[in-house]
Amino acid sequence: SLPFGFPKVLVSSAAALPGLSTRFLRASDIFLFNSVIEIAGLTGLLRNVLDRAALVMTGMLHGPVTEPLTDRTKAIAMTMVSPCERCARAVRVQLEKEGYEVVGFHATGIGDRAMEAMISLGFFRGVIDLAPGGVGEHLYGFMRDAGPNRLESAGRMGIPQVISTCGVNHITPRKSKYTREHDLRRRYDLDRLRTWLRMSPRELKEVAALF
């Protein structure tokens, strides 16, 4: 619940557990410190870990840290993913020529949530939403799930929002949960680890209804 830019450090021996950091960090800009050893008994090793974590916090409190945004009236939020990088770059260049500061969010679900939260806090004057695929991902519970309030914050804040469609027609179920039907779909491989599957006509209609 602490705002973006407020110094935050979390020391945990479970920081590296799969899925745990995602569950607790969500859209927070918290510094996660993996202690490696259990936090029990002040041994020399644990003191070393805690000392370094304390120095991290000291640096954030007293170091020459740049303010999050120098002028919120010039800040524009923009979502993007790999397939629309060229478009995002062109949009950024044009807006910067007009004197705006463009803040990008990787639309992987967590990035979308972070953007919506920061819009609600008044960080931005406008939104360029190139990659709102998290809407459909939330509907079906897949990996880019951006939560139930995706696309809503800008309207509530009364700021302009331009919405495009990159990634809206694809889904990202975990490969370990692929069904036979998933294996038969057209696919788009972003890299060795990430694969998008084409939505069915029924799914496209269901997602379109949400927009």
Q: At which residue positions do the language-model features occur?
A:
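Short Gly/Thr/Asp-enriched flexible loops that form oxyanion-binding sites at enzyme active sites
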Residues: 1-6, 88-92, 141-146, 150
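Glycine-rich phosphate/diphosphate-binding loop of Rossmann-like nucleotide-binding domains
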Residues: 73-109
